[in-house]
């Protein structure tokens, strides 16, 4: 359960890209760093819940505006567990649960999360899907 932007709501691990995620790394080409999104997803999951993940895949994206009026682009991904046990970053999260997409419908989730979980299920089963509101 998240404590920050949506206190008391259930969600999935997440965060933001900062220049610290790549600025001190060697560039992959003369001008660019590659796989930054994947590095950030790995870092955020490790920081927030203590798990190592692999095989990160894009699910969908959304745009929102924060309280200060700043536009935010959210890129949702799915991944496979690689190693580790859940250890919560207490400043971010105070509870966790492993649930199916169907079970998630019984939780007070941030809007759209169940729909994203359903999309991830479709992709895991080899079917392409686009976001649609299910509830």
Regions found by a protein language model. Give the residues of each.
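Extracellular/lumenal ectodomain signal focusing on beta-strand-rich modules
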Residues: 55-57, 76, 95
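Charged phosphate-binding loop/patch that engages nucleotide di/tri-phosphates or the phosphate backbone
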Residues: 114-135
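NUDIX/MutT-family hydrolases
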Residues: 78, 87-120
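A short coil-to-beta-strand element that immediately follows conserved catalytic motifs
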Residues: 50-61
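Short aromatic-enriched loop/helix-cap "lid" or pocket-rim segments at secondary-structure transitions
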Residues: 7-10, 70-71, 111
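Conserved Nudix-box catalytic region and its N-terminal flanking loop in Nudix hydrolases
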Residues: 1-43, 47
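Active-site-adjacent beta-strand/loop module that shapes the phosphate/pyrophosphate-binding cleft
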Residues: 62-85, 120-124
